[in-house]
């Protein structure tokens, strides 16, 4: 599902309830262009679903509260719905009017990278028009006018009962938060603030309280502290008398708590910086708090004391237990990050979340930011092999992988709803880019079938995914969706939860009654269902639970959905027929259970009028709500079912105080409705009365009666006889043009459940499954329902063995879980034998005992042939898995000579630690090669054809790890080398690591240059690995910058003589540390340059040793068979004690000997 998203990243995250605190927020246009001025908010308490760019959408859990105002680029809005209500307003220059309603039921489907924000669901228009065309005098069609079909407008101005109150002294304040708890309470709280956009902080605040439904207000700054700056207002969703105020964390981190609806407060210090709150859905004093440093705290005393639950919690991935699904009401579900950056799913008790008491319901890691707990379901995502896999737990049972059609191959998925024990999901398949397919699940949320293809999606300003899908309030199973067909977007409607869809029939006439010529399927009505990038421009739809037949939306008539020529439409028969009500966008407020509709026009000008309709939009009357035109910033309806009081927030000018206009609609009603004031209305779909398997008859108030009604729901409901229309195709089946559900090409209907054993029974699907929540009875129910059938005996077939994570690798010394899968066969009476390939084998008597997998630990690395054999009385099957067992590669050391001869083969070896890590790939770079040499062996041989310094690099790939080492080698036609030794005290300070050897080599070279005066370019020193400490000294034929010929062999001999002399005279030494002198001297003659090796002997070193031995033997044989016998000469008088030189004595001649060659005395350099 990409991931389970945490709310709504678009700026339009509005809902009537914010955080269960009853907070509805408004920001004026242009005030906040980024999250810098308005930090992101968190999911609201309204159970709405939103989608994120990477994943599972997240329904804002009940009671989640934002810490700061959310960014909204919009105009003011209506806000009303059952329950508590509050409004957040923000004012800027050039205020515009917009009205929006937020309803719990009118849920739009959205997603975002940010927490879910309050969203208008009940009539919030989203575009701006300047004027209402008088009475709608511009028609949509031509022909004979039918006055009976025209929308009537009464232009006579009527007056509503209203009072105005100014929040004196707050003219500079540009934000306001309003809470109206309702439930027979007359208390309204308003928090106004001055937000400095340059500083990015709140600099002033005021708290106001009304006890007479908003007629008058009292300023409470002295009760909370005159110098206290308040930043946010929270209200307990289960007890509206409990209020919580958050101080500005820039100054202090404190909570002010009230238990008397904000009359008095007590201050409590916080030892953390609060970012969001989550109230418990039942216990009024239980709260979860998320801090800015990603720690989760709990309080059982309504914020008076806090206890740390868990650190490193993923933002918005914490939930209270769901009643009925969890036994413990104080259980907390959360997603936490491990030290190495992985995410895990944890549960624990709010006051006892110790390491020992934490549970891990999902084994292993989950994808980051992917946990969602919603109703009876828990969802997580796990990506393996480059593909996302989605898992669900129903009523906290073990997780099962969610099954889509085999070749859906989703690249993104979002859970839209989990209502009525069923999962509704939007899936973007491998071949889709800007559309999603809608899928609906069985009760357990495991098996999904297609409901609608190619539903339009778009990206919000924060990258959030928005799906054009709307669930109509008050009628179960009714949805509207915008589907993309041949690059045209059309609106479809369903009454049976996606089983059947059809286009919307356009109105027969326009506002004036002129006929509209629109023929299906070429022309239809199209509605805006999504929030646009500017969340309060065109695109609004509204419905109410208490008015199930009435839907108000903006849209257009034509061949496709358009962003131009937008009008307002209403349906009073649940979407069967529609009527145009305005030619410009208005926002709609439902009064008196939907018996009265209030419309307020979008305009940038101040207004003082609104429109009322008592007959479901057929006619409208003009009412004034204030004597002075007002720039409207927002409208808040009275909480509760009746909604007869409305407060309009605005200002007379850009510099004036906030003006609060209380509008009382009670005066427009004559009386309470009696039984004779109602008429019956039957829900239907194009004349079909059976909707979701039942006939439902509602009562509606007669249009000519102006009485206050009471909502009673459906007058009566009776089940229908089941027909084929009450059944959808089962998993693995597809509906064909004749209406039949037939198996998909990839599905084998004869496949049995793996739990099915000979003598048992299984449910044999007929290809159909009843639509969840459908109430039909009898009829074809028996014919289409899966029937129990005896399990036939079958030989094993389709055996597979895989690792639990789908990988072909395992780590040495760690558990690897192997899963045995069998398509067919009697799993209860099948013998399974598993050979791990390392000399260990196990047997099982049935497959059921292996459901959790077979765990095994490999002690050695290598490629192991894992075989599994299954047998029953009817046959057998086998499968093989080649498993690569590795261990982590920790270090790579490149071993090769320091100096080599031109055109001579050089051996390079990659020495590994540990030496056995499994299957490896070696990548070699050397010389001037532009392409590497790739081998499976750790050694290579090569030659250099030119002199100079060359770099060799080896990269070793082991699984996901790649390590490398680089060395430099000098190439010359000839050079001299000598082994060096040191005074024994150096060994005490030798840690035997490459860095130390490089530093000591540099010090020795410096000492040699200082003692001999030989240019440093002629000397190369390499300290060798191991103890005792030794080094190799190389004399190189350096060529200076004047491009003179390089040194001759005789010159190298002269340099060698000087070096040997100084070494023999003990003139080369260095100070390792204060008081520690190290003497450098020659060790012995070497026949070839040595190689920098690890303590283990390499092949090249052994070859050198053998070469020395063979040379020694050859010299011995030659001299043994000489005609003249060589007699030893007495020791040279010039030899010094400790002289490590080795003399090769010549046979004594009969004649006087010739002069010795240069350099014959002292140690000899190897050539």
UniProtKB/Swiss-Prot annotation:
Region ranges (Disordered): 38-68, 98-151, 1128-1167
Signal peptide segment: 1-33
Name of the gene this protein is made from: Sorcs1
Keyword Protein biosynthesis part of the UniProt annotation: no
Glycosylation site residues: 184, 352, 433, 775, 815, 846, 907, 928
Residues annotated as domain PKD: 802-893
Positions in the Lumenal compartment: 34-1098
Membrane topology classification: Single-pass type I membrane protein
Protein name: VPS10 domain-containing receptor SorCS1
Pfam families in UniProt: PKD, Sortilin-Vps10, Sortilin_C
Principal location listed in the UniProt entry: membrane
InterPro entries reported in the protein's UniProt record: Ig-like_fold, PKD_dom, PKD_dom_sf, Sortilin_C, Sortilin_N, VPS10, VPS10-sortilin, WD40/YVTN_repeat-like_dom_sf
Subcellular location, record wording: Membrane
Domain of life: Eukaryota
Annotated GO CC locations: membrane
Residue stretches of each BNR repeat: 208-219, 256-267, 492-503, 569-580, 611-622
Keyword annotations of the record: Glycoprotein, Membrane, Repeat, Signal, Transmembrane, Transmembrane helix
Tissue expression summary: Isoform 1 is highly expressed in brain, and at lower levels in heart, liver and kidney. Detected in newborn brain and in adult olfactory bulb and cerebral cortex. Isoform 2 is highly expressed in liver, and at lower levels in heart, brain, kidney and testis.
Family: Belongs to the VPS10-related sortilin family. SORCS subfamily.
Transmembrane segments: 1099-1119
Basic and acidic residues composition bias: residue spans: 111-133
Cytoplasmic face of the membrane: 1120-1167
